């Protein structure tokens, strides 16, 4: 299966770019960058994707499409959207794709 990497295509936060570079260095092979804010609408071939970093501007864009096979490491839920993000659909998705590696105790 091909690999995807989460990218943040419309941000000026250098930390988002650094996290993307770290994953690219880790996987060290061919990959496609997928926009963090539109993972739900990905409709290309299935890909394994490391899900890491800060989630997200629009909680309605989660969970990712069924063509994304996630591995959650260093995952963080933005506290400002947690009440909208952690709906029954998202919680079911996270349970289905356990374990979820989180980067902080809040998440």
Model-derived features with residue positions:
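Aromatic- and Gly/Pro-rich donor/ligand-binding loops
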Residues: 1-107
């Amino acid at each position: 299966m091909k690999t995807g990497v989460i990218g943040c295509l419309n941000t000026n936060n250098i930390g988002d770019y650094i996290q993307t570079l770290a994953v690219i260095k880790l996987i060290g092979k061919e990959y496609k960058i997928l926009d963090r804010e539109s993972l739900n609408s990905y409709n290309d071939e299935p890909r394994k994707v490391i899900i890491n970093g800060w989630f997200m501007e629009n909680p309605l864009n989660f969970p990712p499409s069924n063509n994304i096979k996630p591995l959650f490491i260093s995952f963080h839920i933005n506290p400002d959207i947690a009440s909208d993000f952690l709906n029954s659909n998202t919680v079911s998705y996270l349970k289905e794709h356990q374990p979820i590696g989180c980067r902080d105790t809040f998440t």
